[in-house]
């Protein structure tokens, strides 16, 4: 029983007791019941001291009044939330096929085919919120490779196109250096290759004067410095992107 319900119960008992004292008939009834009558001047000594009876009566009235006053300030209870009304964390973020997988068994879906926001959450998302949260991040990758047996999924369509060329063998980026016949499936691969012809080394170590053609080579070198911090590489990249 809650505290508020208990207060109601005690107040009701007090009021019932007061009512019983006022309703006891003057004639007949058990001697014990007669003692519950309201104090009157006719009360005899065998029924006890009238002053004590009156004090009892006043005490009951005071308690009942206090409890009723307390009920005025009873806190409003907020409605409890049932698990059935909870929304799935990954609601409207796409179906299970959006999750990166190596099996490739589930078909891909377009954004128009995503789960209806008004549909009920799955039992798995309610029982295991951590799994649902993981699915939310994975479902952000909606571009799945359509090649048979490949289950890779990408967040950008351009990344999917570049990956798909691995299956088709297409290399649309030829090197323009004289007498070089190499072709590449990705533009960044061509850019790195082209620096081998020009000798350009645009990635400079922030802790020494060495330069490198590739950013990964710079990172590998910079880690050898004891005072190196990854933020140094990020600052140097921003400086290259914004020379002014």
From Swiss-Prot:
The gene name on file is KLF9
**What positions are modified (Phosphoserine)?**
122
Q: What is this protein's record name?
A: Krueppel-like factor 9
Transmembrane helix as a keyword? no
Cellular component GO terms, alphabetically? nucleus
Task: Alphabetically list the UniProt keywords.
Answer: Biological rhythms, DNA-binding, Metal-binding, Nucleus, Phosphoprotein, Repeat, Transcription, Transcription regulation, Zinc, Zinc-finger
Subcellular localization is given as: Nucleus
Q: What is the lineage of its organism?
A: Eukaryota, Metazoa, Chordata, Craniata, Vertebrata
**Which cysteine pairs make disulfide bonds?**
none
* Subunit: Interacts with ZZEF1.
> Which portions of the sequence form the region Disordered?
24-51, 80-142
